[in-house]
A protein has these predicted regions:
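Alpha-helix capping and helix-loop boundary segments enriched in small/acidic/polar residues
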Residues: 39, 79-83, 125
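Divalent-metal (often Zn2+) His-rich catalytic cores of metallo-beta-lactamase-fold enzymes
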Residues: 47-107, 111
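Catalytic core of the metallo-beta-lactamase
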Residues: 1-50, 57
Length: 166
């Protein structure tokens, strides 16, 4: 038996996982990462931890994450959950701080880096994902619940904001 399920939003609003109950194997897609940055440009950051709880409730023994090595021991499964939760929580909490301080996007990026870089700066695709991650986290922390669609104009707006003068 193979189950295709939506257990809640996280990486996107409509994340789907594949669960093989007889083998206790979970294909999590980008809801979980291992040794790689989480791409959160289209995420529901506030809701993501509850979705991780729903995944954990399945009690998977092996997880195939969206990026990174397969998690095939109890320790690596626990570590994958902790890592993803920490990435998402650190990102959102630092963005909330930046919004509370009324920082512009460039300043918010610098602030988020002070929290994110020491923990995650070494992982795969971190530098690629971070501008999109911080932009979405600042949006969500500012009250924009649903991600804005990434258009060419929005992409330009983001890069302009990140390069703007302080």
């Amino acid at each position: 038996e193979v189950k295709i399920m939506h257990l809640g939003p996280g990486h996107t609003k409509g994340d789907t996982v594949v669960w093989v109950p007889s083998e206790k194997v979970l294909f999590s897609g980008d809801l979980m990462e291992a040794d790689a940055a989480c791409y959160t440009g289209d995420a529901q950051l506030e809701e993501w931890p509850a979705t991780l709880d729903a995944l954990a409730a399945l009690k998977p023994e092996k997880i195939v994450p969206g990026r990174g090595p397969a998690l095939d021991t109890p320790e690596s499964v626990a570590s994958g959950f902790a890592y993803t939760r920490d990435f998402v929580s650190t990102l959102l909490s630092s963005a909330k701080e930046a919004v509370a301080m009324k920082l512009n996007l460039k300043q918010a990026m610098a602030h988020c880096r002070t929290k994110m870089d020491p923990k995650f700066g070494h992982v795969f695709i971190y530098e690629h994902c971070l501008p999109f991650d911080v932009t979405r986290a600042v949006d969500e922390a500012s009250g924009i619940k649903h991600p804005r669609i990434w258009t060419a104009e929005r992409d330009k707006e983001m890069w302009h904001g990140l390069q703007a003068a302080d």
